[in-house]
Amino acid sequence: MRHQKSGRKFNRTSAHREAMFRNMAASLFKHELIKTTLPKAKELRRVAEPLITIGKVDGVANRRLAFARLRDKEAVGKLFVELGSRYATRPGGYLRILKAGFRAGDNAPMAYVELVDRPVVAEEVAE
């Protein structure tokens, strides 16, 4: 019985799972919008939201803590410079998960994960 066991395994080893979410969080911070499967998106929220909370208070200790969890200098820099100030007054709920239908190959439920309050750039429509 797996009572009180939180988190999904995704049929991966713990190291593979940790690396996968580390890379997904770094990609989310860099691009502010990623597409993944719905279960991975829900689990990514448990990794990314505490990192954004850490990014709200800039300091050497917090930067080192974030780097230990992300292992990506560019993502950590953006986390503290841009995202930390953007969400300084928001008490949580930094991510939005939008369902995006089902994948063609295996019918897996897909979702977009985006940072709320991200600047939306209007794309020019070719006539």
Swiss-Prot record:
Q: Which UniProt keywords apply?
A: Ribonucleoprotein, Ribosomal protein
InterPro entries assigned to the protein according to its UniProt record, in alphabetical order: Ribosomal_bL17, Ribosomal_bL17_CS, Ribosomal_bL17_sf
| Swiss-Prot/TrEMBL GO biological process terms | translation
Q: Which GO terms describe its cellular component?
A: cytosolic large ribosomal subunit
Q: Which Pfam families match?
A: Ribosomal_L17
Keyword set includes Ribosomal protein: yes
The molecular function GO annotations come to: structural constituent of ribosome
* Alphabetized Gene3D superfamilies for the sequence: Ribosomal protein L17 (3.90.1030.10)
Q: How does it assemble?
A: Part of the 50S ribosomal subunit. Contacts protein L32.
* Matches recorded under NCBIfam families: L17 (TIGR00059)
Query: What protein family is recorded?
Result: Belongs to the bacterial ribosomal protein bL17 family.
Q: Any idea what this protein is called?
A: Large ribosomal subunit protein bL17
This chain's source organism reads Xanthomonas oryzae pv. oryzae (strain KACC10331 / KXO85)
Instruction: List the top taxonomic levels of the source.
Output: Bacteria, Pseudomonadati, Pseudomonadota, Gammaproteobacteria, Lysobacterales
Gene that this sequence comes from: rplQ
